[in-house]
Design a protein with these regions (language model features):
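Acidic/His-enriched low-complexity segments
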Residues: 1-231
Length: 231
């Protein structure tokens, strides 16, 4: 199946489904080419018994469980997971091995040639969120998102929400949890991770942060950027 979503498919899916929430767990310690992505999706179906699909572009999906029952391996074709006999209320769990990008699609992985530092960041507009986690990847199917990220100890991890829990190091890794977000489209979700240099400020009680590679520190201009952001 081609990695494409037609207008008719998006229209049909929007009329059939209501997405409530995503819980997304990303393990960014697995290697240089891939990372582990675990998605738990809660959604409703307007016509119980109907079929649909969820988007996922990944080298492999090791576990797909819909409403407590495992789906056959051929339900996943590399870009989509076929979902049959949907209930009125549904829970889907997908464990996948997703690929890093070097071209800015999905989870981009960059190695700084100056010091070898590795930096990761998502670029999901307009149809690339499903390269990072299984999702109904269209703007009108909004939902709440809760991210948990495991990353090398010493890295910064950033998402749409401020982290509420940063676990103690376990081996060479640390676990970051971000609380559920307001409803948003899949392409608006974001994760960045790496040994970023951080300049922090705040405005009217709202925390501000400016992140950059260690080799391109912006401390000298941080007051300017913080001032511009406040406006």
């Amino acid at each position: 199946m081609t990695n494409n979503l037609t207008r008719d498919e998006a229209h049909e899916r929007a009329g059939l489904l209501e997405v409530v929430s995503y819980q997304v767990e990303l393990d960014l310690t697995a290697g240089e080419e891939t990372f582990t992505s675990v998605s738990t999706v809660i959604f409703r179906c307007a016509r119980p018994g109907a079929a649909s699909f969820i988007d996922l572009t990944a080298p492999a999906a090791s576990e797909i469980i819909l409403n407590g029952g495992p789906l056959a391996a051929d339900a996943f074709d590399g870009n989509r997971i076929a979902l049959a006999q949907l209930a009125a209320e549904n829970e889907l769990r997908v464990v996948a091995r997703c690929a890093y990008s070097r071209s800015g699609e999905g989870m981009h992985r960059f190695t700084d040639p100056a010091d070898g530092g590795v930096y990761l960041y998502t670029d999901l507009e307009t149809f690339d969120a499903h390269r990072v986690y299984a999702c109904f990847d269209q703007p009108d199917l909004k939902a709440s998102f809760e991210f948990t990220v495991t990353a090398p100890d010493g890295w910064q991890v950033i998402s749409n929400m401020a982290p509420d829990v940063t676990g103690a190091p376990a081996g060479n890794a640390r676990r970051w949890h971000f609380p559920p977000s307001p409803q948003m489209s899949t392409y608006i979700t974001a994760v960045a991770a790496g040994p970023y240099h951080v300049v922090r400020s705040e405005h009217d009680g709202i925390p501000l942060g400016i992140y950059c590679r260690v080799t391109s520190k912006i401390s000298s201009g941080s007051r300017y950027w913080a001032s511009e952001t406040r406006q």
